[in-house]
Design a protein with these regions (language model features):
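Nucleic-acid substrate recognition interfaces
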Residues: 1-356
Length: 356
């Protein structure tokens, strides 16, 4: 599989060179946008359909940009390639990338393996060395990469490398019920606590926002993101190592983000956890399944009878007893067990689903 290895550029003084290169990247990107929009304007004016420019068409049109803007020719090719991918995947045409102002695009400088040279903890691009913190070894099978900039104007170098999918995995099977009070409850009774990272720093963030200290506001937001990703990485790695089957409920964060629970839902980062579990399961050669979680919290995981608490009014009931078999359940653990049953296709979570 393809993994991205990200390292922070160590020498802050080279930022001006990367800033200059990123402005050149924006110039090539904006030229591609101009070509695309000129075709659209001609179609509106004349009604004659023209073929959209392909990757090779854009590279041919951008001939000479590499020498003029001091970019590697493969960088120009990668920009054109990414433009075509974005145009075909997005609902709207790609927009111009601003190099300045409040809505400027963050720096981005793509390359392929032959455009750079690795020298220990240095990467050489167009005869200039960029020193980075080499926190872990870089695999030899580098495919592509890029220099990227974050909101705090810090630069990173990223390498996309091909790594084998042969990490050892356990023999367990686990179902995971995502929630807000507890971030994730597993079918074996384990839980991942909801640490509410944003709420922990909310007061400090409000103070700096009122003071107009943009630098500290960016630093606090970065701290929140780093702490959140650290927790999710540790939890997802542990689950992927110990289980050969991982089943997660398909709760929609996008829909719940439109409700009054939006802050808690976005702070929980369910989608990020699911994505981590998916690619880590693939690397450990485990199965990852998103299961339909309807009725899983109301159905008894022992007999399948729908006798659990229903609706928002009974959401506060965390423990209940099945009226059919008399089994006592923790609401979230019971839901996680039913999610595992659905994903493993051993039996339906309920015997009879009542008609709506």
């Amino acid at each position: 599989m393809i993994l991205t290895f990200k390292y922070r550029i160590k020498d802050a003084t080279v930022g001006k060179y990367l800033d200059r290169h990123s402005r050149s990247v924006n110039a090539v990107w904006n030229h591609c946008v101009s070509v695309q929009r000129s075709i659209e304007r001609r179609y509106i004016a004349t009604g004659l359909k023209e073929r959209w420019p392909t990757h090779f068409d854009l590279v041919k049109i951008a001939t000479g940009y590499a020498a003029t803007l001091e970019l590697h020719s493969d960088t120009v090719s990668q920009i054109c390639k990414q433009f075509v991918i974005s145009r075909n995947a997005a609902r709207h045409a790609p927009r111009f990338r601003a190099s300045g102002g409040p809505k400027r695009a963050l720096g981005w400088l793509p390359f392929i393996k032959r455009a750079v040279k690795l020298d220990g903890a240095h990467v050489v691009y167009r005869k200039r060395k960029f020193h980075f913190w080499k926190s872990r070894d870089i695999p030899d099978a580098i495919k592509t990469g890029c220099f990227t900039q974050d909101a705090r104007d810090r630069w990173y170098v990223c390498f996309q490398c091909e790594v084998p999918d042969d990490l050892p995995t356990g023999n367990g099977e686990i179902g995971i019920d995502l929630g807000l009070k507890t971030l994730a409850t597993c079918s074996n009774g384990d839980t991942i606590p909801a640490l509410q990272h944003y709420r922990q720093f909310e007061a400090a963030l409000a103070v700096q926002q009122r003071a107009g200290n943009k630098r500290r506001v960016k630093a606090i937001h970065a701290k929140i993101a780093n702490v959140r990703k650290d927790q999710l990485h540790k939890a997802s790695t542990k689950i992927a190592r110990e289980n050969q089957l991982i089943v997660v409920g398909n709760v929609s964060a996008a829909q719940l983000a439109k409700t009054r629970m939006a802050k808690s839902v976005l702070d929980a980062s369910w989608s990020m956890l699911r994505n981590m579990l998916e690619y880590k399961a693939s690397r450990h050669r485990a199965r990852f399944i998103e299961a339909d979680e309807r009725w899983t919290s109301q159905a008894c995981s022992d007999c399948g009878a729908v006798s659990g608490p229903k609706g928002i009014a009974q959401l506060g009931i965390r423990h209940w007893v099945c009226s059919d078999c008399g089994c006592s359940h923790d609401r979230d653990v019971n839901a996680a067990r039913n999610i595992l049953f659905v994903g493993a296709e051993r039996r339906p979570p309920v015997e009879e689903i009542p008609a709506l």
